[in-house]
Amino acid sequence: MRFLAVGLLRSVCLMAVVALGASASVAPAAADMMALDGAWSGGGSVKFPSGAKEAARCRANFKKRGAESYQVSARCASASGKVEQSALLTYVGGNQFTGSFFNEEYKVDGTITVTVSGNAQSVSISTPAGSSATFKLTR
C-alpha cells in the first residue's frame, strides 16, 4: 500500500509542478514576455485514493517546446518519499495551460492544469486512480 501511495504521490506532485509552470503565459503573443523557461518551486498538498492527504514540495524546470507548449521535468517530495516526473503542457487560452504527465518509475500518468497569475502558478493534477494534488509555484 505504501509503495502504491508513494508512486501516486510522485505522479501527482510532478503533475502539479508541470501545471504550475505551464500557466505562466497569458496569451501566445505574450509568451516571450511571460516565458516559463527555467526553474520554479513551491508547495501544496497531495490527496491519495484512500483519502489521506500529505503536504508536498516541488521543483520544476520548464523548457519551451513550441509557440504554445512547454516540456516540464519535476522533482517532488512528501513524507511518503520523492519522485521525478515529466509533462507536456499546451496553452489553451487566457492564462491557462493543460496537458499530461508521466512518472516512469511507477508507470503513473494523468492530467494537469496550470493557471498563471503574475509570477505565481496554481497547479491542479489528477490521475485515473483517484489521486489529486494542488500546488502554488513561484520563481
Features from the language model and the residues they span:
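Polar low-complexity intrinsically disordered regions
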Residues: 1, 26-27, 62
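Bacterial N-terminal signal peptides that target proteins for export
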Residues: 1-15
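C-terminal segment of classical bacterial N-terminal signal peptides
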Residues: 15-28
